[in-house]
């Protein structure tokens, strides 16, 4: 029996065995992998989303009730159970992806669907050592990666056959995924964007009511995520509040290109009661960023803001940007904000002090954002545009390959040209299903690049969600007849 003619049953069995060997094998080799941010989820830190912290809490509570409080691989044994559970979840979702592709395109492409997901996982584990992306890592990505695959399958299915049950699954899993990892708001944006294009502009699917249904569900998803987050914090901390520190990354990004004149934006806060002397806080933060050379003027090759060029500067610029961003946030903004709250609001307990510090960050974010938007298309906004477009380019590059060695940048460019050429050929040759799937995958990839590039900085752990799907749909376009 050739692989080409393999039955659905045998295909499912073989791929399930292969996936089990790979992912369970990794758990047995590594045990639970502890990363830099792991402890904050275990501690149910106020800066973290509710979903993953609750999963860890439930496992911990269950094992304590059963009297299983020993260690495995040098960590509490319940973390090994979490790692195994996560790995089984990966197995099930990737197997589901393989079976979905088998259903429409046969065993070869179904096998490639499984292969590309294993390949991405293997690259993360054995070549790139991206610890947070392993199935056995005690990190939100360990659930977000397979959930992103599952949501993509549901979005494919929504346009394969429009069903209420698919919409319900999309809604529920979207809420779950964002509750676990806020970064997955990018999928909600993808869903809304795809629905907008398909239901309003593509003749076969044109149905404005269906777009409105998706839009209502999208808004409802945001409301549910917020309600879950606030209810969780009320149960844990006694206050109805979303997790804090959500604006710091965006402030880091804006501070990287700010000029001395930005201090004047905060002069109105000199006599503010809600944010007393916020102008002094911002001036301190800005001056410290400059003093430590964490701003755009200090990347290698900088001559002047006017001479900045995306074409010539983006590689060195984004490298410097990525190196300094966390330092801007965690060594300047966050401690400065905490010191500010301690000085002007000493009566607040720890929880309310964190809420106040978050409000301070939101206020700074709002002021800087409005100013950046106002000047974005002007001469003064040139540096902002260069950083944004440079980050977006990097996002696209590392979603398909990497920036090092630099030959991979050119290779990724060729791959995108090939992808679009195949996409157009699929449209011209009536391969509608393949073209639709390629469009949805690329939409998710593009939204992730733009949002991540605008809010923080692209790095492989943020960008590889679509990688396996990107190469899968490219192969579907090339191989399917």
Please report, for each region that a protein language model flagged, where it lies by residue:
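Transmembrane-helix motifs of polytopic, lipid-linked glycan transferases
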Residues: 84-107, 150, 154, 422
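Extracytoplasmic catalytic/substrate-binding loops of multi-pass membrane glycan-assembly enzymes
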Residues: 27-73, 77, 242-243, 353-358
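Membrane-interface anchor segments at the N-terminal boundary of transmembrane helices
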Residues: 77-89, 346-446
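Juxtamembrane membrane-water interface segments immediately following transmembrane helices
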Residues: 34-36, 40-42, 218, 222-342
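Transmembrane-helix signature of polytopic, membrane-embedded enzymes
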Residues: 95-127, 145-146, 162-169, 439-440
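Membrane-interface alpha helices of multi-pass inner-membrane proteins
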Residues: 167-181, 218-229
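Multi-pass, polyprenyl lipid-linked donor-dependent membrane glycosyltransferases
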Residues: 123-155, 177-190, 462-467
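Membrane-interface transmembrane helices that cradle and orient dolichyl/undecaprenyl
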Residues: 149-166, 481
